[in-house]
Amino acid sequence: MIVPEDARRFAGRALGSWRRRRGTTPPAVDATGFYAATTVGPGPRGAVLATESMSGPAGATTWRVRYRTLDAADRPVVASMAIAAPTGPAATPRPVVAWVHGAVGVAPGCGPSRTGFDAWYGDRLLGEGCVVVAPDLTGLGVEGSTHPYLHGLTAGRAVLDAVRAAAELSTTGAGPVTALAGHSAGGHAVLWANELAATAEGDGLDVRLAVPMSPIGDLTVTMARYADDDGRAAFPVQLAATWADVEPVVPADALTPAALARLDDLHTKRLAGLQHTFRGHATRWIRPGGLTTGAWAAALERQSAGRRPGAAPVLLVHGEADDDALVGWTTTLAETIRTTGTEVTLRTYPATDHMAIHDAAQDDVLASLSRALGDDG
């Protein structure tokens, strides 16, 4: 694809051996202090604040990184990520692929980089000569701030600044050419990052392709379904409980007293644990109409994806048997993106559910990334 001398070091490796942790165990403990709350002063976005070596794929050098980004109110905050690069010097600047995880919980200890390098297709992308960055997203990983679940502006900024941080680490060999990929909530972050990259927020970056996989796009439609569903209440609860710092909304307007009484669980449990806490029909936890009227409705509309032009073409992939994020949502999303003037391709996969999309779409996704990152314009 791009850097053949890097590819040889990864020949024959299995695909996707480093994948997202999905457990019921409590969030990871920060044993080294790397993720301790950190005050961040003036400085450029994406500035590297600290690094720490960590285990990762064979043939790659892998680090945890703390870097500077902005929250939705333009306040500087510290975010964390994992980054892996082929070991050894790069003959030419390496392209960067940012992989954005789906829902994991909202506590700092849920940050994927705390437990390892976590990116689908990571082995293959490294073998193709790419640098792979896996941002935790603001509030996940580093202590001291709240992760506003599905808040597009916050997530999009953290993704773009993770790419900037990769380029600042000279040992990675990372250049400006970038692709963005992510699953579910991570797909929402990718869409936002691509849209931000088309503005001054993307200065210095060359984004070539965005690949949202089974993404969340229209937050109003998504939350309306989840708030009147059996078994998915943890998702609107996470959103309603974490947006007060980034939007003019009040959690109690959307959450029932029963939900408000259990919000401490958000600080101690991963997603699967939260799904157990907030089990049963969502109306036990979400006020009827609470997320679809008034200030909450306006906030969800503001943070929905696909409303603004993107810097790069978009490849949407979605499983037709997905009952978590419906394929019809993404069909509509493709139409919405098209109205912005952004090039968009939609590919759907029969008999494929929310998680199976990774394997079903891998050939299409990897081939598309190869073409985009290998295009010299």
Describe the role of every protein-language-model region.
Residues 1-89:
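Catalytic-loop region of hydrolases
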Residues 71-129, 142-143:
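Short, surface-exposed "cap/lid" segments of acyl-processing enzymes
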Residues 149-170:
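Alpha/beta-hydrolase active-site loop
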Residues 164-235:
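Primarily recognizes the serine-hydrolase "nucleophile elbow" in alpha/beta-hydrolase
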Residues 288-298, 324-377:
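C-terminal catalytic histidine-bearing segment of alpha/beta-hydrolase fold enzymes
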